[in-house]
């Protein structure tokens, strides 16, 4: 953040500004994420998190898990991707409202149990999706007006993307 932009926000009271020592155990995004939870946010969206260091990006994916544990919808969004851990184990995606063309699913634990994908080009019916599944659920496409996703256990990371 340039000094000019920081001064603009400070002088115009656009948002509360908190400054931290750069020598700390948490990333700036971790601190912002925790603050959003403490303030009672009903939804959290992180912008600009995918274009730089992968270690920071993976840390932010862990932040999504923290929000999921508290049943708070949280998203990582850039111009080509919307990444989330859905808080419900059964949900719909309307084709006209989806972000991009592709939908991918990844287990964040050992497995996602009994995943069912309906309305997709590559459907699944009560399939066990292990974390060793590779590309099984990558770049699927919605082929019906509404796609349905359900599963019975595990933590499911969903990526909606476009070229």
Where are these regions (language model features)?
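Charge-rich, low-complexity amphipathic helices
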Residues: 31-32, 39, 58, 76, ...
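Short beta-strand segments
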Residues: 47-49, 77, 106
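A generic short-segment signal for beta-strand/edge and adjacent turn/coil regions
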Residues: 14, 43-45, 70-76, 116-119, ...
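Acidic/Gly/His-enriched mid-domain segments of enzyme catalytic cores or analogous surface patches
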Residues: 1-70
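Class I SAM-dependent methyltransferase SAM-binding "motif I" and its flanking Rossmann-like core
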Residues: 55, 65-98, 103
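A glycine-rich helix N-cap at a beta->alpha junction
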Residues: 16, 21, 72-75, 102-104, ...
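Long, charged alpha-helical interface segments
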Residues: 86-163
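Short coil/turn connectors at secondary-structure junctions
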Residues: 13-14, 40-42, 70-73, 100, ...
């Amino acid at each position: 953040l340039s000094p000019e932009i920081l001064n603009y926000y400070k002088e115009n009271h656009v948002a509360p500004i908190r400054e931290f020592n750069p020598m700390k155990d948490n990333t700036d995004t971790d601190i912002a994420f925790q603050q959003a939870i403490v303030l009672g946010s009903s939804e959290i969206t992180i912008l600009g998190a995918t274009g730089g260091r992968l270690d920071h990006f993976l840390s932010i994916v862990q932040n999504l898990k923290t929000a999921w544990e508290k049943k708070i919808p949280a998203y990582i969004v850039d111009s080509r991707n919307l990444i989330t851990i859905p808080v419900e184990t059964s949900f719909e995606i309307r084709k006209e409202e989806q972000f991009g063309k592709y939908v991918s699913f990844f287990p964040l634990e050992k497995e996602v149990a009994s995943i069912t994908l309906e309305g997709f080009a590559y459907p699944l019916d009560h399939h066990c999706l292990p974390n060793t599944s590779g590309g099984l659920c990558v770049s699927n496409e919605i082929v019906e007006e509404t796609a349905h996703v359900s599963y019975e256990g595990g933590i499911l990371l969903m990526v909606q993307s476009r070229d």
